[in-house]
Structures are given as structure tokens and as C-alpha cells.
Amino acid sequence: MQETGIRNGAFGADKFGLKNLKQLHWNLGAPQLYQYSLAAGEATLSADGALCADTGEFTGRSPKDKFTVRDASTEKMWWAGNQSITPEQFEALYQDFIKHAEGKTLFAQDLYGGADPTFRIKTRVFTELAWHSLFIRTLLIRPETIELDTFVPELTIIDMPSFRADPMRHGVRSQNVVAIDFARKIVLIGGSYYAGEMKKSVFTTLNYYLPARGVMPMHCSANVGPKGDTAIFFGLSGTGKTTLSADPNRTLIGDDEHGWGPSGVFNFEGGCYAKCIKLSQEAEPQIFAASNRFGAVLENVVLDEDSRVPDFDDGSKTENTRSAYPLDYIPNASRTGRAPHPKNVVMLAADAFGVLPPIAKLSPAQAMYHFLSGYTAKVAGTERGLGSEPQPEFSTCFGSPFLPLDPSVYGNMLRQLIADHNVDCWLVNTGWTGGKYGTGSRMPIKVTRALLTAALDGSLRNVEFRTDKYFGFAVPTALPGVPSEILDPVNTWKDKVEFDKTARALVGMFQKNFAKFEAQVDADVRAAAPDVKLAAE
């Protein structure tokens, strides 16, 4: 086996069982990975030098194909939200991965998951594709070159899209598979070319290990103001985590995954993974610039045949087009990936029913209620099979697919942290106003940014609030520079009766979803629920 690159010779691929490989390239940088990727026909170049790859059948994660080994060490797993396989099935899968790798050229990256040295996890990723190696090198945190000589991984991932699982032999659903063995700290990914599976496997692993060490893992973006006032933004895909945290007046910590521990907030990653459908220089100049340069990786973005300029408006391959780029491509990004304890927690919801206010102040009990609810709404075009009506999505802790432990573990941690650090909590609707999807319009991003700025700089503490009659939270009645009618959603609807009907329907959806948590939360959290009786008056 021919090996190239800087590595720990005393702890190589043989420690993982890999043998009889054709070649193994260790810790290559972007120029070399570009070269291998283009030579193999894996990807093409954009006009400005981004590496562009298609992921074929899978243009997003496949949560139904994700499995975890069930054994004595994982009895604390949240099995209601996770699928299991036996240790024997995983071992058969592992052996078949090892056999499948024989004779192939693989790429290895030694990386850190986590910017805090106390809590980071040393991660080794073997990939079949050069562009996947560049992707994960971009998304995780790269060690100093001198650290590679002695690097010993705690977590090992092997990612081979050409592998096909056998459902009968391996105990899985299809030929596509993501399998995690927490006891052995191994992740096996096969069948999918979608690179995001790798990064989310690291996130899932950190979600499993960190709570026991006093760190709350979070599916959120984070930034910090000039006075050291950190803000975190929870939200599901498409709600604005990446967009709203990229603020030229604040330092970006990260756009997707963070831990909140004894010394503050830290990024799990060293890169960003932005949705880039309809990306424009005018609306998101920082992300646009980062996506149009050497070192960026574009997934499923259509290029003009002649000019090779990306057409970010073209969703013909998928609405889930993506751009991966190093965090330092954002001019005001943190170089440490760390920040003080948050002063503000923001929960983002893209409410396609158009009844949530653009911003609301949450009590600590309401914050836990909305965190466990994890609400947003999907509309046609974001996923296959959606009709013309909005579909509510409740993804607990704003990250249900990545939670190995019971949601109450994360909810209780958040509540304690909010209390310990006297954090202000906000719910922000980045969805629709003036009617639901199809009738109303998208909440203007200028309005959202103005309200967020007022929340983060303390201006909203000095305004008058009303209590929302449907949801019970506090809503500002006026704010300089923001049209007052937009602050109360009913004023933006022509049909007030239809608004009332829609608002009460959404309240009912919240209540129905939260029923499964009622036995696990305190009375004040149950009391923080939207009140159907009040809403029905």
C-alpha cells in the first residue's frame, strides 16, 4: 500500500483494520484534493474556483437509514427517536466495509470536533472521494501540522458512497446506511454521496458524550457583539441560522453546531455549510463571496454550461443546494471559535401559517416549552411530496435527528443555563406575514434584522409589550424604524376571521405535539403552553 502525507506512523490505517488498499493519502490540503477530485471526474470547477459536485439520488440526509448499536452502553439512548441494530449486525457491516475498501484509493483526514481543547473529540475520517475529504477538512477543525505526527483518534468515520448495505445481513432498511457504534466510537457511512452525513455524524457523537461532561450540545448558530455579548440562534434548516448570524457588526462564532459549557460557548466546527438556493450578493454578501472562491465546495449547484458561473436560483437538482467553506472566509469570523456565556437565546421559526409575531419575548418556562417543541413549517418545494398547504414540523430541541439522548436531558440543561446566566430569550418568526404561505409574503429580512438588533443591544427592554392572546408570550407594540402593524400579525391579514381560525389551529398543533413531554416537565412549563381555551374565546 502506497501512503502519502503527514501522519502518525505508529497509529495508521491498520489500527482500524484497513488493509490491502491501493493508496492512502493523509491530510492533503485543498490544492491536492482539487487535483485528485478533478482528475477522477468527481467534480467540476466554477468560474471563480469553487469545487462543484453532484450527490445523485441523495441530496440531503436520510434519517430513516441511520442506525445505532444497541448494547449495555447505550441503554440511556432515546430509542423513541433512534433506530437500533445489534452488535453482531454492526460487526458484519464493519467487516464488509473493510473488505469493500480493499484495492481502493482512500483519503484520510485527522481533525477535531470542538474548538474547546477540554471537550473536543479527535476524529479520523477515511473517505473514498477526494471532494468528501476536502468537505470534512473544511467543516471540522484542522490541527496544527506538528500535532498530526502524534494524532490518535477517539472517533473514526469511514465514508464510502459506492458501498451497498444488505438489509437482511446488516439489519438496516436499504442499501444506504449510516451506522454508529458508540462503544467502539466508529461511524460507517455507505450508499450516499451527500457529504452532510459526515458532519452530522460527528454532531450526533458529541450530542451523546458531552452532556455527561457538563456541556450542552446545540443545533444553533452563534455570534458575539463588541461588548462580549454572545447570542445563540436555534432553528431548523431554512429558518435563518446562517443568514442571521452573519452580521457585519458582530463576530461570527459559527453557523450550525455549538457547545455551551463551564467557560462559555464554543463552535464544534471550523467551517460553514450554508443553504444557497437563491443566494445573492445583495441579500447575503458574505456568504455569496465565500461561496465563489477557491476552497469552497458547492453541492448540487447548477453551473452555466459555458461560463461555469453558478446559478444559485436554479433548484432543478434540489432545493437543498449547499455551500461549504472555511469559517475564515467570513471576514468577521472568530479565530478561536469561542465566546463568553450567552446574553441572548433566539429561537427561529419559519412560520408558514403567518400567525406568529416577528418577535416575542419568552419567559424561562416558555423558552423550555418552545425549545422542546422545536417548531417551524415546511412549504412546497422544500421537500418531496408536500402539497400547497404548509405542513408544521416539530423537531424537538431544534435537532431531533441528531439527539441520541432523551430530549429532556437537553431541555433541562438549557433551562439551568438560562437561569444561571440570566439570559434573555426570544422567539423570532422568519416565515410569513399578511397571510399564510400562498397568500401572504415572506417576513422582510430588514425587519427581522432590525428587531434582532434591538433585542441584542438591549433596546427592546425599554419598549411596551402586550401579551399575545393565543400564545401567551410578550410582544412589543412599537419600535422605532419598524412598521407597528407588522408587530401584531392580525393587523397584516385582510381576513381577520381567517387569521383567528388559523391561529387557533396552530395552537392546537402545538398542544398535540407537546403531549408527549407533559409528564417530563415541571408545572410552570406545562402552564407556558399556548392556551386553546383562551384562543377559542
From Swiss-Prot:
Keywords assigned: ATP-binding, Cytoplasm, Decarboxylase, Gluconeogenesis, Lyase, Manganese, Metal-binding, Nucleotide-binding
The reaction(s) this protein catalyses: oxaloacetate + ATP = phosphoenolpyruvate + ADP + CO2
- InterPro entries given in the database record: PEP_carboxykinase_ATP (IPR001272), PEP_carboxykinase_C (IPR013035), PEP_carboxykinase_N (IPR008210), PEPCK_ATP_CS (IPR015994)
Subcellular localization, per the record?
Cytoplasm
Provide the GO biological process annotations: gluconeogenesis
Q: What is its EC number?
A: 4.1.1.49
* Highest rank taxon of the organism: Bacteria
| Name by which UniProt lists this protein | Phosphoenolpyruvate carboxykinase (ATP)
Q: Which family does it belong to?
A: Belongs to the phosphoenolpyruvate carboxykinase (ATP) family.
This molecule's function is given as: Involved in the gluconeogenesis. Catalyzes the conversion of oxaloacetate (OAA) to phosphoenolpyruvate (PEP) through direct phosphoryl transfer between the nucleoside triphosphate and OAA.
- An annotated GO cellular component: cytosol
Name the residues that bind Mn(2+).
200, 219, 256
Cofactor: binding details: Binds 1 Mn(2+) ion per subunit.
Q: Name one GO molecular function term.
A: ATP binding
Q: Please list the residues that bind substrate.
A: 61, 194, 200, 322
The protein's matches in Pfam families, at most eight in alphabetical order, are given as: PEPCK_ATP (PF01293)
Instruction: Look up the record and name the cofactor or cofactors this protein needs.
Output: Mn(2+)
| Residues reported in the UniProt entry to bind ATP | 200, 219, 235-243, 284, 322, 448
Q: In which pathway does it act?
A: Carbohydrate biosynthesis; gluconeogenesis
